[in-house]
């Protein structure tokens, strides 16, 4: 599953996340972001990592009702303003020994809800860069989010639960830093 997020969805690592008007199921997703360092088109898997500038922490915030219901579309549910907090910094590729061996976690209001590792990614980083570059040119600064471990709100048991104004998300990836976002209602 691939989708694009607009620049307007980008925000800083500790900026508030705005829950859009009409949102009912705003959800969290801690993810490893792969930052492209040089133009990549039709790149082989063997060469793919040489096009990576580095790695960042990403919170792929999602509005599940917009995404999956009401004639939902992935872009609509993923693209709201502030729905892609990135940072706190870019760690260059040479400083990450193995990007497929990083622990990542996310807490909501102090409760650990996601605790995983990039070793469990469905698709490896080289495979993602190669695959995507086969149908769209990747440019320096493009970010590929690699997917999230179990524990999103949609998957909570016994019942799903979602973010509301006042909730605080805190998340991190080993060696890439931490983020903290407070959820606010759209004005």
Q: Where are the regions that the model predicts?
A:
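Hydrophobic beta-sheet segments that form the core/acyl-binding groove
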Residues: 15-22, 30-32, 36-40, 106, ...
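A generic local secondary-structure boundary/capping motif
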Residues: 17-26, 40-47, 74-78, 92-96, ...
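Catalytic-pocket segment enriched in acidic/His residues
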Residues: 64-187
């Amino acid at each position: 599953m691939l989708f694009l997020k607009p620049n307007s969805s980008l925000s800083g690592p500790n900026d508030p996340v705005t829950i859009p008007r009409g949102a009912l199921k705003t959800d969290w997703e801690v993810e490893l972001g792969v930052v492209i360092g040089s133009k990549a088109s039709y790149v082989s898997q063997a060469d793919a990592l040489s096009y990576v500038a580095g790695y960042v922490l990403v919170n792929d915030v999602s509005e599940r009702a917009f995404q999956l219901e009401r004639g939902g579309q992935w872009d609509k549910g993923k693209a709201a303003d502030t729905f892609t907090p990135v940072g706190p910094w870019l760690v260059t590729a040479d400083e990450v020994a193995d990007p497929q061996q990083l622990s990542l976690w996310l807490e909501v209001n102090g409760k650990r809800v996601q605790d995983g590792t990039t070793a469990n990614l469905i698709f490896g980083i080289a495979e993602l860069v190669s695959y995507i570059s086969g149908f769209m040119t990747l440019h320096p600064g493009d970010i590929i989010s690699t997917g999230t471990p179990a524990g999103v709100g949609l998957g909570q048991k016994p019942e799903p639960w979602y973010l509301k104004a006042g909730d605080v998300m805190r998340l991190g990836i080993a060696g890439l830093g931490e983020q903290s976002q407070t959820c606010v209602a759209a004005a």
